[in-house]
């Protein structure tokens, strides 16, 4: 079984340019694995519930996974656990991840469930798998032409490493109105990512 989890963090949903590129990545995955299952998790409207006092209490009290307050977290973690690869499409908001993606992270990073706290630091409890992050930024945040900082990339790398994911690629689509050449360049990078290159190799 080759399951792909697609996490879409754009408030524009399927209408966003990032989502359009993501659909092309998904199509490449499905072409390599016609019977693969794709699970889509949209973080736009209506979005995930806010972190509640009951949820916070369940974490502190180390309640069992079956506790109703942990239901949303359990569902999101299960989607990650059952995947063989993860595709995240996200805008960059104020130099970092949007609030909707931060909320998903807060539900997925859970002590005793996706990571363990040890004297040496946090250790991931999930097996590594390829992750591809498509980043849509209105400003230029990389290279000599950068005019704004990028806190999204190092933050997401650390977040994913905490739960055990180290095979992570980032592809960026920058600028308010990227031209066709920029979009084609992004398309060319898709096949070079661990997520899609590995799948192409497996079917060769």
Swiss-Prot record:
Keywords from the UniProt entry: Flavoprotein, FMN, NAD, Oxidoreductase
InterPro entries: Flavodoxin_fold (IPR003680), Flavoprotein-like_sf (IPR029039), FMN-dep_NADH:Q_OxRdtase_AzoR1 (IPR050104), NADH:quinone_OxRdtase_FMN_depd (IPR023048)
Function: Quinone reductase that provides resistance to thiol-specific stress caused by electrophilic quinones.
Annotated family: Belongs to the azoreductase type 1 family.
Complex formation: Homodimer.
EC number: 1.6.5.-, 1.7.1.17
Taxon lineage: Bacteria, Pseudomonadati, Pseudomonadota, Betaproteobacteria, Burkholderiales
GO molecular function annotations of the record: electron transfer activity; FMN binding; oxidoreductase activity, acting on NAD(P)H as acceptor; oxidoreductase activity, acting on NAD(P)H, quinone or similar compound as acceptor
Listed name of the protein: FMN-dependent NADH:quinone oxidoreductase 5
Entries under HAMAP family matching the protein: Azoreductase_type1
A Pfam family annotated for this UniProt entry: Flavodoxin_2
Cofactor, how bound (note): Binds 1 FMN per subunit.
Binding site for FMN: 10
The organism of origin for this protein: Burkholderia lata (strain ATCC 17760 / DSM 23089 / LMG 22485 / NCIMB 9086 / R18194 / 383)
Entry cofactors: FMN
Reaction(s) catalysed (UniProt annotation): 2 a quinone + NADH + H(+) = 2 a 1,4-benzosemiquinone + NAD(+); N,N-dimethyl-1,4-phenylenediamine + anthranilate + 2 NAD(+) = 2-(4-dimethylaminophenyl)diazenylbenzoate + 2 NADH + 2 H(+)
